[in-house]
């Protein structure tokens, strides 16, 4: 019995030793677990890289990119129609011009004036032609008592016109007083005449007479004449265009129905040499001062500062002169 007890005691001791050994292995295992914790720490250090990736997400966010590119490529059909600006400019009111002369409706000069007005881009001229049926040079401001007859015709180039049986002033009177036209012209152009109408001769000029007939009816008027000899109408038309370009606003600023102070008389030389030297504002002359009225003009003449329309014309300038509405008193 005693031996058995000893054996049992020995067995218990062995079990205790085994348990102790087991505890020791657990501690060793626990000691070797430290590297595992280190590995876990290494994994934890990779988290910031994930965080960096997460930070980059806003720069590539799909909600940001469309918002940036939409204004550049997006069409505007969604805008309300009411806010769409107009794509057309309202048409410009035409400038209404009555054209007349004293050489008759079939003369080259009046047709050249008509064609030059129609060639303007801006403003748009609405041209109406009413002129004597026949040549009426030298008739001044003469007019017929009572109504006059008129006939539909065409100018040299085929433009519609009305031919009046009477004086140059009758043509204007028929248009404005007899109801020949149904509007009030913005201004009247008389000419261009075949031959100059300088100061000493304005009162016998039918070209000036027709312009005066318009002016006394409170309508601005221009009388334009081309110098004798070669009748350089092209040069005259250039002068007329230049004059209108610089003075159209003044002509159109005239208030309908208010008095007109003067007629503008323009005389353009036909140059035998050189070219017209430009437009110059001068008063009417009272005599020819020795100039040959029917001679060609040397437009290379160097003289400057002409005193009147006679000097200006014969030294190569286009003379622009305000002309009284009434003829100068005789005697």
Which stretches of residues belong to each language-model region?
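A cross-family phosphate/adenosyl-ligand binding-site feature
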Residues: 93, 115-171, 176
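Bacterial signal peptide processing site
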Residues: 24-27
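Extracellular mucin-like PTS domains
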Residues: 29-91
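Electrostatically charged, flexible surface regions
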Residues: 236-331
